[in-house]
């Protein structure tokens, strides 16, 4: 009976929550990286060098870093529904204002404010999932949610490329139309969040009483079973495992946002139109979505996290190194596909680790710390790519630099599993009935 009840409850909460938060993350990721498509013509229109563009694209993560932990602590206090709605509405407004950038100062200021507005969204969702799904199911659920990132590349790239072709309509440049149109869904969905999301299982009126009682009891028992798990905010901030995971995420973020922000310009160097760039940039994401889900399921099935992160990081590093020697659209496409698969596959097992040893306010602070420090890689990676491109005239040096960061991420993950293990980087494997 319990087996049937568990299956029914998990299916119901998955269908209720996961597709919706996937949609939210799809919009969030698109608004973060559409700057890469804007650069195809915006840089020339506004006279931006590669260095200026790289710093402006990356400065988003400085604002994100400064406000990430406070934002997640507020979410833990006021509830996911209200705070995620606030985050989405404000970031949608700021993203739309990007259409009116006039020069370097306004570019830097608005990208910084976009990071401030969006701070807390991603770790807030990770924390939110820990309220609803048992640890043994979390990597697979996280993978489905995080598949929205490569999906936003698959679907968003052609859309962004097409919107760039609206150049001159009503006197606006194509990149201005892209910012305005792609910002609107965030504001609309922010309002929908207020009416759709449920903060905690205890408040889930869409579950029957038996289903709700089972879920609350299961999640409470899991929290109690952690025993030595840290609960205070300070413990979440000071835990050496949190700092180590932040370093790992730093490298993967550098890879992710180097890919998202610079890939359109790397592809554009082969003489393609914005629309062609959009369709080609979409291809790697198709493979990444499938690989991410399969990799996370394997991680859950075996109960292993460490090597799933290490292998994925090394694959992405190989892809970046391969991209430095790409001489055709086909070879650069293979390289970008390897990077996409590696980066995407690293995320679900990595983000399943913090909630194994943290709970309550410590989890809120710890997850936000990992995300905020780690996302500084999203500043360092794109900024270094731009500076090295201006200095050397080539993307190669910057790509090698980011590949090196991913190798460091793999090494730190291995060291962490041996010096500060939590079940040796393993959880109880999923029992398939």
From Swiss-Prot:
A GO CC annotation given for this chain: plasma membrane
Domain of life: Bacteria
Induction: By tartrate.
Membrane-protein topology: Multi-pass membrane protein
PROSITE patterns from the UniProt entry: MFS (PS50850)
Localisation: Cell membrane
Family stated for the protein in its record: Belongs to the major facilitator superfamily. Phthalate permease family.
Entry-linked NCBIfam families: 2A0114
Protein name (record): Putative tartrate transporter
């Amino acid at each position: 009976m319990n087996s049937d009840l568990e299956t029914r409850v998990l299916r119901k909460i998955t269908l209720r929550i996961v597709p919706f938060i996937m949609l939210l993350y799809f919009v969030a990721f698109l608004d973060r990286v559409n700057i890469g498509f804007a650069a195809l013509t915006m840089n020339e229109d506004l006279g931006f060098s590669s260095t200026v563009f790289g710093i402006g694209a990356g400065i988003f993560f400085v604002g994100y870093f400064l406000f990430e932990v406070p934002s997640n602590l507020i979410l833990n206090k006021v509830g996911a529904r209200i705070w995620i709605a606030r985050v989405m509405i404000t970031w949608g407004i700021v993203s739309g204002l990007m259409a009116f950038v006039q020069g370097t100062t306004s570019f830097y200021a608005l990208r910084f404010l976009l990071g401030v507005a969006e701070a807390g969204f991603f770790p807030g969702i990770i924390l939110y999932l820990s309220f609803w799904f048992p640890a043994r199911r979390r990597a697979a659920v996280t993978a489905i949610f995080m598949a929205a990132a490569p999906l936003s590349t698959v679907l968003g790239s052609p859309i962004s490329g097409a919107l760039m072709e609206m150049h001159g309509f009503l006197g606006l440049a194509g990149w201005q139309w892209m910012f305005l149109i792609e910002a609107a869904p965030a504001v609309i969905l922010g309002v929908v969040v207020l009416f759709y999301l449920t903060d905690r299982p205890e408040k889930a009126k869409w579950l029957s009483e038996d289903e709700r009682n089972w879920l609350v009891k299961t999640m409470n028992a899991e929290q109690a079973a952690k025993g030595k798990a840290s609960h205070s905010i300070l413990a979440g901030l000071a835990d050496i495992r949190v700092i180590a995971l932040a370093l790992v995420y730093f490298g993967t973020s550098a890879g992710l946002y180097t890919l998202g922000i610079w890939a359109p310009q790397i592809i554009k160097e082969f003489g393609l139109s914005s629309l062609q760039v959009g369709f080609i940039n979409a291809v790697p994401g198709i493979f990444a979505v499938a690989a991410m889900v399969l990799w996370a399921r394997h991680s859950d099935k075996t109960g292993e996290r460490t090597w799933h992160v290490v292998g994925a990081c090394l694959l992405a590093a190989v892809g970046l190194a391969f991209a430095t020697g790409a001489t055709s659209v086909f070879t650069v496409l293979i390289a970008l596909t390897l990077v996409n698969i590696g980066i995407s596959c690293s995320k679900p097992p990595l983000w399943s680790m913090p909630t194994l040893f943290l709970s309550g306010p410590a989890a809120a602070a710890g997850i936000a710390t990992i995300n905020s420090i780690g996302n500084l890689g999203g500043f360092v990676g794109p900024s270094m790519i731009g500076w090295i491109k201006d200095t050397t005239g080539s993307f190669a040096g910057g790509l090698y630099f980011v590949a090196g960061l991913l190798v460091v991420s793999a090494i730190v993950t291995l060291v962490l599993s041996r010096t500060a293990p939590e079940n040796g980087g393993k959880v109880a494997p999923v029992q398939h009935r």
